[in-house]
Amino acid sequence: MIEGPYFVLTVLGALACGVSAGVFIAFSAFVMKGLAALPPAQGIAAMQAINVAAVSPAFMVVFMGAAVLCLVLAVVTFVLWPEQGTVELLLGSALQLVGAFGVTVAANIPRNDALAKLDPEAPESAGPWRTYVSEWLMWNHIRGGASLAASASFILALT
């Protein structure tokens, strides 16, 4: 049975991954759809503002906290190799670290950086905006699914 500080780390990992999943899924379910329905200039400007606002302590604590917790959980799991939950803890950690954090760094952030360079009012920005929405959403679906699966995996480790 997982107990003590290891239990607390696992619960915190499940919560952090679950909150991350909620943020990602909200963007996939309605935020990006709403922005895509706007005229391109408005959608681009709104997403540029969202990307600036996202670099906030509240979001960073959740996003980076989930990654740090998963890294710590993976290391502790390798060291302790508990009788229960080992596979679930390692799987959950890998899902969050690769499927959410890794995808963010490798796919979503570069697209956000490219979007930041667009002039919302320029007519030629409409094409890159449509491409951005499509590609960013695909990667965001992966982040949301990975975070949700990571949270579920940690919960399973506790049962």
Positions of predicted regions on the chain:
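Juxtamembrane boundary at the C-terminal end of a transmembrane helix
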Residues: 155-159
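Interfacial segments of alpha-helical transmembrane regions
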Residues: 3-18, 79-98
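Mid-bilayer segments of alpha-helical transmembrane spans in multi-pass integral membrane proteins
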Residues: 97-106
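Hydrophobic residues within membrane-embedded alpha-helical segments of Major Facilitator Superfamily
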Residues: 9, 16-19, 24, 69, ...
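Core segments of transmembrane alpha-helices
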Residues: 63-73, 143-151
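Interfacial loop at the N-terminal end of multi-pass membrane proteins
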Residues: 7-8, 19-64, 110-134
